[in-house]
């Protein structure tokens, strides 16, 4: 019998989703792909732990067409992923 993979739900803080929607389409696609990997229990190559914020808090960092985009997400004990911040890095 084939093994079924459990995909964690991804929830968004309202402000993070609003900011994410302003990202260019190409950047959104790549970042959503990285979030999908996290939801399936993996870690994308462009994701790294954010030290000092507790275990399970990670940042997805993307350089896209000369700009830098970030998503910060947390994996909760209830096996949920929460996107808590999305922003375009200015410097």
Label every model-predicted segment.
Residues 1-68, 77-81, 88-91:
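Basic, Lys/Arg-enriched alpha-helical interface segments
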